[in-house]
Amino acid sequence: MNNYQVKAIKEKTQQYLSKRKFEDALTFITKTIEQEPNPTIDLFELRAQVYEKSGQYSQAELDAKRMIHLNARNARGYLRLGKLLQLDGFDKKADQLYTQGLRMVHKMDPLRPVLKKVSQRLNERILRTRPVLDLFRILPREVLLCILQQLNFKSIVQCMQVCKHWRDCIKKEPSLFCCLDFSCASPRSVNSRDRNVMAVARYSVYSKDNIQEVIGLEKLGILTPTKALLRSVKSLKVYKTISPLHTQSTDKLYTIWTPFSELHYFYCATPITFSIASKILSCCKKLKQVELVDLIPDLIFDSMDWDKLFNAESVPLALKSLTFIRNQKFPFHHKEQQFLKDLLSASPYLEYLEASYQSDLVAAIKKYKINLRSLIIIDEGVSNTVKDLAFLPQSLTTLIVKPCNPASTILCPYLFPTNVRMESLINLELFLYLRLSQNDIDNVVKFLTSCYKLKKLVLHDSLALAPHFFEIFASLPELEHLEIPDNVALQNKHAIHITDCCPNLKYVNFSNSISLDGSGFIAVLRGLKELKRIDIINCDSVSRDAIDWARSKGMQVTVASSLPNSQPLGTKKIRLI
């Protein structure tokens, strides 16, 4: 049957329908279908239309199903059957049918956009008419408040969109809006800046102007303090940026944060210059914890005005924790060193410091008598000369020396103090230089033996220390956490000696120690009564039977990395000399 014949049949059928002669139209189209050896979906669509006009929905649905059966890639059958199901009151079945149609219909079908639009419209109508279980009328307020406080901020906003009653109840709880966390905001939300400003203004009203924490506000495209946040300046104590700020005027970035004079904690993942950092620190006098993880130099270092902001005679800062990490893509300038030195001189209460290594860092700590409790040194690998850590505060409980990139190695040895006993040091993590000289080895060994109260020890790239393991661990009787990964020289005798000297060990990591076999593994398990977990990743000499025996005793044994597609722990980037 060609297109002209189909067109003639349609015109004659429409004539019957216009005169409301449903029986004549039905007889005509049915006779045509019976006479046609291979009826097309056009004929069944015409008859379904006639059935629909005459109110015979069940018969019309059968013809619509025949249309889908004849050509499942054509949208007309799904549109016809979906409409009939809705007329019969089966909205859910129609919704499922439209979903199936969107999967099956060809992308080039001209009616596919119509099918998609009809599906979306039906879905919206189902959501509007769907009965909502009103938990706010069933559960007590205290129970609901406890539940909502476990949700993240995005989930709370979604709950407000369920219905008007939910929104009215939630916005009456100021405690739910003390922390505005926009870290889950969609990247597209930056395009709706004005709407976002109004939303933040509403949250400020809901919180009774008591917002205490803001996270990721830059994801909403808001680069300056809004009126909503300025209302709550007196209460804002935590501000975190988690993504870069795309702005032309980087020299004006400090205006975003300086109005919040009551800030206690400031975390900035946004690249900011030293001048901006100095203005923030000088304006927010009550800052106790600052994390600057991507500091970049000013365009013209010599024109910076921060060199007079901090010194020993200025008003001391309230800082207790400082993370000060520079961006390595930019060359080092001597004024960066002076900036950190001045900052330390104005921070007498500092207890935690994480910073890129600088030559006079230890001298500044000693000069200004800073009683640090935790010191983390980031080695940038810029210089190959020996780096001085010969002075460490007696108040220090945690010391970490690590490379800027976990997959890299330390490019030079560190000089540790050996003339004093580190009585307060409890946690120690060291990445060692791979080519230690004998003097450097002696220095590290003396330092480790002086830390006799250590409870946690992590040694990376410790191959050079293997001959001294007996001396080192004999001095660490209180050790509870030990990690010596990537040491191919670690043998059964060393493991047994560690077991005898450190009976309180609860966690041990011997990963990539290929010389350790099943007998040494069993000896460690039997000797350490407090042991709860042991890692032996890539220790192929330890048999499966020994591992199964350990697990049968309730021991947690890790034999494979939990990170997908991760490289072996011993694989490092080594700069060849």
From Swiss-Prot:
GO terms in the biological process aspect are: donor selection; negative regulation of mitotic cell cycle DNA replication; SCF-dependent proteasomal ubiquitin-dependent protein catabolic process; telomere maintenance; ubiquitin-dependent protein catabolic process
Signal sequence coordinates: none
Record PROSITE patterns: FBOX, TPR_REGION
Keyword Mitochondrion tagged:
yes
* Organism domain of life: Eukaryota
One GO MF annotation is: ubiquitin-like ligase-substrate adaptor activity
**Where, in residue numbers, are the TPR repeats?**
6-39, 41-74, 76-108
- List each copy of the F-box domain by range: 138-180
Name the keywords, alphabetized: Mitochondrion, Nucleus, Repeat, TPR repeat, Ubl conjugation pathway
Q: Where in the cell is it found?
A: Mitochondrion; Nucleus
Q: What is its main location?
A: mitochondrion
User: Subunit arrangement?
Assistant: A part of the E3 ubiquitin ligase Skp1-Cullin-1-F-box (SCF) complex. Interacts with cul1, mcl1 and skp1.
Alphabetical list of PANTHER family matching this protein:
F-BOX DOMAIN CONTAINING PROTEIN, EXPRESSED, IM:7136021-RELATED
What's the protein called, per UniProt? F-box/TPR repeat protein pof3
**What organism is recorded for this protein?**
Schizosaccharomyces pombe (strain 972 / ATCC 24843) (Fission yeast)
Q: Which gene encodes it?
A: pof3
